[in-house]
Amino acid sequence: MQQQSPPEQLDLAGMVADLNSLLRLKTTVIGMKMFATVEEMTAIPKIRRPTAVHTTDQIVSMASRLGWTVGITADDLVGAQCRAVIGLAPQDEKFLEGTNYVGVWHGTPEDARKRQEALDVVAYGKYLALAVSPLSSGRLDPPDICLVYATPGQMIILINGLQYTGYKKFEWGVVGETACADSWGRALKTGEPSLSLPCFAERRYGGVPDEEMLIALSPAHLAKAITGMKQLAKNGLRYPIAPYGIQADVRAGMGASYAKK
């Protein structure tokens, strides 16, 4: 029987350099990795451990805004919501009730429960720890997922890159509050690229700017997007997208791409 070749080793630092060249990103691209034991997490080089209680949003932003490598367990997080999304607490009946959100984010217990049931979460019982780190550091090699914060204009070019070959229509949802379930929760659960509009908590506690969206995707999907974006750039479809002029004759601009078609 023919032996299968090992998966291709990705140049994570090179991928980040390509991303920054293609999209001019403001925010550090990071990796996220789950661990079955705390010891595996603490063995990561130069890992920091929190000395206070945080939201997962804050931990993620310590990597994406400050460039830190940070590891956590359930005890480092503020409550069941943060823990449950990443599989560090059970998604039990108490979690599904969402009592804390009634009269805050939702008008009735029924609404709160529907939201809780709609969340994409990592199954409980497999992992005990999580770490985040700048992707270019290579400390999480490989990470389970990569997190890319980008403006809408940058994000659509990245998505176009993913769709350049092997086209797939992406259908994403918006749970509202706890939007981290739309990004890293869904990507960790399904392995699929997952786009989100960062929620109130991510912006208040994680410091995500108004103009940024978030996509979580595997290193392989990110590499595919980069390959696609490079080809798009050769075709004249690149970031920044230069405004053509709302009153200009569009034929010259369209002709650059489609005249020979």
Give the ranges of each region predicted by the language model.
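Cys/His-clustered metal-coordination modules, chiefly Zn-binding fingers
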Residues: 1
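Acidic, serine/proline-rich low-complexity intrinsically disordered regions
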Residues: 5-261
